From Swiss-Prot:
Monomer. Directly interacts with TNFRSF1A death domain; this interaction may be supported by TRADD. In the absence of TNFRSF1A, interacts with TRADD. Independently of TNFRSF1A, interacts with the NADPH oxidase subunit CYBA. The keyword Transferase applies. It comes from Mus musculus. The gene is Rfk. Disruption phenotype: Mutant embryos die in utero before 7.5 dpc. This is Riboflavin kinase. It is found in: Cytoplasm. The active site is at 79 (nucleophile). Its cofactor is Zn(2+); Mg(2+). The lineage of its organism: Eukaryota, Metazoa, Chordata, Craniata, Vertebrata. Its EC number is 2.7.1.26. Zinc or magnesium.
Length: 155
């Protein structure tokens, strides 16, 4: 994908509530206008990168972009799992994301357990990839230092 790394930010909105409740893997969801403005060559699938909430620390993350076939979503979504434990929810805060690599396409699963297992595998692979020097340097990108109040797509 020519668009990677891809930088975007937007206000965290409520999703379906499945990430925490059903999967044990909480996600922060972008509003529709952020998803609708993704570059055409950013295909659906699972990606990895860096994320921060507001002006907070930058953490590793995985993000699902698409329709989540297991749940048969009718609207395209962008759901970010930040690999960090937060003390409380952060709905309404600005989420800053740098997508740096692609893991796999979206696919359906025959059970909730196999979906959870795949996501856990994605998280482990993302951790490894983000430790590589070419990805690690993006953690300190100026994108995470600029004014956090501006909602934008692109860099």
């Amino acid at each position: 994908m020519r668009s990677l790394p891809f930088f975007c930010r937007g206000q965290v909105v409520r999703g379906f509530g499945r990430g925490s409740k059903q999967l044990g893997i909480p996600t922060a969801n972008f509003p529709e206008q952020v998803v609708d403005n993704l570059p055409a060559d950013v295909s659906t699938g699972i990606y990895y990168g860096w994320a921060s909430v507001g002006s907070g620390d930058v953490h590793k993350m995985v993000v699902s972009i698409g329709w989540n076939p297991y749940y048969k979503n009718v609207k395209k979504s962008m759901e970010t799992h930040i690999i960090h434990t937060f003390k409380e929810d952060f709905y309404g805060e600005i989420l800053n994301v740098a997508i740096v690599g692609y893991l796999r396409p979206e696919k359906n699963f025959d059970s909730l357990e196999s979906l959870i297992s795949a996501i856990q595998g994605d998280i482990e692979e993302a951790k490894k990839q983000l430790d590589l020097p070419e990805h690690l340097k993006l953690k300190d990108d100026n994108f995470f230092q600029v004014s956090k109040g501006k909602i934008m797509n692109g860099h």
